[in-house]
């Protein structure tokens, strides 16, 4: 998927009836607000603004679907851990995201994104724990690697690995500025997809 021929927004929603049919495999992206999720998706698909970036944490409160090369769906899930949003919005986030993750049969992998400069938060640990409980393949992408030195990156990678209980092959490094890690992340995603199954339309017999 390194060669991107098309990338387009499909739809947004908060409930299953808003989702696309589910006839394409889906890769979902999740993480705390402002970890660089939108920038990661834009670089992966070679687009500057397919996914809008925002300096306001918690701005994205919908599940957004993007079709790539007509053969794969990238799913942008709302960021968590945001402080400056109404309590009711925070209460809605959990059920909305859990409904998608637990019930989407075409979901092939979740990319959990963490900032290299931060210690993983409790929400990150709980999200990873939840995904593992549902046996959903996970790739942890460590973003903003251009913001720290190589020595600091190594220290933080070790800290993130210990905090989340990750093996080296469960992590990938990324920089939106230099595009470091783009090809490696696609390779990991494609390897995970190859181990999975062909999607069936949600609600239809297997």
From Swiss-Prot:
Residues 23-195 form the EngB-type G domain. Necessary for normal cell division and for the maintenance of normal septation. Keywords: Cell cycle, Cell division, GTP-binding, Magnesium, Metal-binding, Nucleotide-binding, Septation. GO terms for molecular function: GTP binding; metal ion binding. The keyword Nucleotide-binding applies. PROSITE patterns: G_ENGB. Its cofactor is Mg(2+). Mg(2+) binds at residues 38, 60. The keyword Protease does not apply. Belongs to the TRAFAC class TrmE-Era-EngA-EngB-Septin-like GTPase superfamily. EngB GTPase family. CDD domains: YihA_EngB. InterPro entries: G_ENGB_dom, GTP-bd, GTP-bd_ribosome_bio_YsxC, P-loop_NTPase, Small_GTP-bd. It comes from the Bacteria. It comes from Geobacter sulfurreducens (strain ATCC 51573 / DSM 12127 / PCA). Pfam families: MMR_HSR1 (PF01926). One of its GO terms (biological process) is division septum assembly. This is Probable GTP-binding protein EngB. GTP binds at residues 31-38, 58-62, 76-79, 143-146, 174-176. One of its GO terms (cellular component) is cytosol.
């Amino acid at each position: 998927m390194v060669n991107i021929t098309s990338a387009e927004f499909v739809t947004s929603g908060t409930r299953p009836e808003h989702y696309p049919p589910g006839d394409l495999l889906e890769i979902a992206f999740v993480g705390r607000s402002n970890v660089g999720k939108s920038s990661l998706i834009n670089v992966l698909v070679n687009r500057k603004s397919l996914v809008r970036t925002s300096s306001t944490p918690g701005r994205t409160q919908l599940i957004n679907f993007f079709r790539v090369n007509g053969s794969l769906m990238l799913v942008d899930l709302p960021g968590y851990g945001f402080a400056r949003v109404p309590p009711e919005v925070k209460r809605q986030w959990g059920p909305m995201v859990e409904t998608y993750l637990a019930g989407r049969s075409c979901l092939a992998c979740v990319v959990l994104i963490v900032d290299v400069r931060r210690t993983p938060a409790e929400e990150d640990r709980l999200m990873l724990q939840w995904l593992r409980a549902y046996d959903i393949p996970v790739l942890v992408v460590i973003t903003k690697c251009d913001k720290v030195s190589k020595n600091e990156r190594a220290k933080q990678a070790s800290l993130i690995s210990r905090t989340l209980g990750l093996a080296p092959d469960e992590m990938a490094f990324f920089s939106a500025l230099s595009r470091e890690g783009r090809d490696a992340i696609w390779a990991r995603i494609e390897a995970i997809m190859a181990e999975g199954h062909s999607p069936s339309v949600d609600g239809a017999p297997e």
